[in-house]
Amino acid sequence: MLLEFTKMHGLGNDFMVVDLISQRAYLDTATIQRLADRHFGVGFDQLLIVEPPDVPEADFKYRIFNADGSEVEQCGNGVRCFARFVHERHLTNKTNITVQTKAGIVKPELGQNGWVRVNMGYPKFLPNEIPFVAEEPEALYTLELANDQNISIDVVNMGNPHAVTIVPDVLTADVAGIGPQVESHKRFPERVNAGFMQVIDDKHVRLRVFERGVGETLACGTGACAAAVSGMRRGLLANSVEVELAGGKLQIEWQEGDVVWMTGPTTHVYDGRLDLRYFQG
């Protein structure tokens, strides 16, 4: 069968977006892995699925699958692209959209020239909300790594789990070495996204993220939210912060006790069709 799809990206964090309202398809783990292959498939960080909602207050259901085929709760760059996709495909004429995710409801607002502002919901910090194994809540935790190495982390759930550590320079940070250890650390029973943040000043940070089930990506929207919130909680950052990632910049806003707002661009790369039989087992 022919499957229609759209390739999009948010700051280089790239997606294959599939409308399963207007067409039907079964995409299992192995099929998703083959589609994600950058040499033999479409190639993407995440697969985004548009489905009818299960709850009356939502316009759409938004499902996210990593390149390894694992389903995750949230993707910030993805939800911006999702909002643009459903609007451009005329699945809705709304510019303020209510979207159901595994992590709850998010509310993207379409702006001009592909920019989207998203209400990302409330950040969570308690160990059982991450989830993270700890005897009691603390401002910072020490994580033991290989070769007697320790790092200090903050933990934040932005719909998916994040560990944030501050580094002197993101360019020299050992993301490739430390990232996989943090991602699969035994204290994170559902694994975690590992963020490495450099504070430039109180309104500007640089960030690299080693994403759960993907590896390092050019940008991570929920990672930017988690890093900014972590810095704000530590008293290092103002309530509105520019987060600079390899793929570009996001603006993150947060007040204690309120929801997190993320604003950033989206890019529609191309539309395509493929014969799904070639990617199924």
From Swiss-Prot:
The pathway noted for it is: Amino-acid biosynthesis; L-lysine biosynthesis via DAP pathway; DL-2,6-diaminopimelate from LL-2,6-diaminopimelate: step 1/1
**Localization (cell):** Cytoplasm
Recorded E.C. number(s)?
Answer: 5.1.1.7
Q: Where is this site: Could be important to modulate the pK values of the two catalytic cysteine residues?
A: H162, E211
An example Gene Ontology biological process: lysine biosynthetic process via diaminopimelate
Residue ranges spanning the membrane: these are none
InterPro entries reported in the protein's UniProt record: DAP_epimerase_AS (IPR018510), DAP_epimerase_DapF (IPR001653)
Q: Which reaction does it catalyse?
A: (2S,6S)-2,6-diaminopimelate = meso-2,6-diaminopimelate
Q: Which residues constitute the signal peptide according to the record?
A: none
Which residues bear the site annotation Important for dimerization? Y270
Task: Give one Pfam family.
Answer: DAP_epimerase
> What class does this enzyme belong to in the EC scheme?
isomerase
* Catalytic site: C75, C220
Q: What residues does substrate bind to?
A: N13, Q46, N66, G76, N77, N160, N193, E211, R212, G221, T222
- Can you provide one Gene Ontology molecular function annotated for this UniProt record? diaminopimelate epimerase activity
Q: What cellular component terms from Gene Ontology apply here?
A: cytosol
- Predominant location: cytoplasm
What keywords appear on the UniProt entry?
A: Amino-acid biosynthesis, Cytoplasm, Isomerase, Lysine biosynthesis
Query: Oligomeric state and partners?
Result: Homodimer.
The task this protein performs is described as: Catalyzes the stereoinversion of LL-2,6-diaminopimelate (L,L-DAP) to meso-diaminopimelate (meso-DAP), a precursor of L-lysine and an essential component of the bacterial peptidoglycan.
Family, similarity comment: Belongs to the diaminopimelate epimerase family.
Name of the featured protein: Diaminopimelate epimerase
